[in-house]
Design a protein with these regions (language model features):
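Alpha-helical packing segments of well-folded alpha/beta enzyme cores
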Residues: 16-27, 73-84, 130, 161, ...
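Aromatic- and acidic-residue-enriched carbohydrate-binding clefts of CAZyme catalytic domains
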Residues: 1-10, 46-72
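Active-site-adjacent "subsite" loops/lids of carbohydrate-active enzymes
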Residues: 1-26, 30, 125-126
């Protein structure tokens, strides 16, 4: 699909799902990788309009809406990658993991009864990424939601989202790691507290479901570009990174 001056792989096409699965299999067969990791790109954040209308007409299932059809397309991609990784592990006696780092909001509670107490963009309906289903189906070994907001962000408060993700993975086989925005301190008034990230790490300890944290990006940690960012990372390094971390 060509849209917004970009070339996008259309997951509504069976050939695309086959291609993505084959690419993952090629990586598994030829490289000694620890994991297959996907970032937060599924359907684009921008509305693609009717760019995939012909594919929808050709492959829709019964009375599916285009929205549920798109979600199912992404589900098929995720399931196929999961199966490819599992097959590789059985055949090669390996323990390669499959994980995803999605946008931090699955759905808002006002639009979906199982959603979080948020008012932001929803990956379920914008990117057609049903991350909650992937966890319930145990298709993921780990998930790293990008919770790139502060405790005081009205539309997406940090604590509400951490609580939601911890509750969502509870009882599943999917391990939860929280994605933190190391690049944000000092970039806006809301991020002017150098203790924000450290407070987030402290809050994480309330939930035994949280196995660890990930930061974006490496550059912000080791080459901070403003005073508040530097203070934020120094606090984490001195208080939280004094000891070796356990390997997931």
């Amino acid at each position: 699909v060509i849209n917004f001056n970009m070339l996008l792989l259309n997951p509504g096409e069976p050939a695309v799902i086959k291609f993505i699965t084959a690419t993952v299999t090629e990586i598994l067969d030829n490289y000694n990788v620890d994991a297959i990791h996907l970032d937060d790109y599924f359907y684009p954040y921008q509305d693609i309009g009717n760019a995939d209308a012909a594919t929808f007409k050709r492959y829709r299932y019964r009375n599916d809406s285009i929205y549920s059809w798109r979600r199912n397309n992404v589900n098929q991609v995720i399931r196929n990658i999961h199966l490819a990784v599992q097959s590789h592990n059985r055949q090669k006696n390996r323990k390669v993991k499959f994980g995803i780092s999605p946008f931090g909001i699955w759905a808002n509670k006002k639009d979906h009864p199982q959603g979080s107490l948020t008012k932001g963009l929803q990956s379920y309906s914008v990117q057609y990424a049903d991350t909650r289903k992937w966890i319930q189906q145990n298709w993921l070994d780990y998930i790293v939601p990008q919770i790139y907001w502060t405790f005081e962000t009205d539309a997406a408060p940090y604590a509400a989202l951490v609580d939601w993700w911890a509750s969502t993975v509870r009882g599943s086989k999917t391990q939860l790691y929280i994605g933190h925005a190391a690049y944000q301190p000092g970039k806006s008034e809301r991020w002017n507290n150098p203790h924000e990230l450290a407070n987030q790490l402290r809050y994480n300890t309330r939930h035994p479901e949280i196995r660890g944290t990930c930061f974006f990006s490496y550059r912000s940690i080791f080459a901070p570009d403003n005073k508040i960012q530097r203070q934020a990372m120094e606090k984490i390094i001195l208080e939280y990174w004094k000891y070796p971390a356990k390997t997931p």
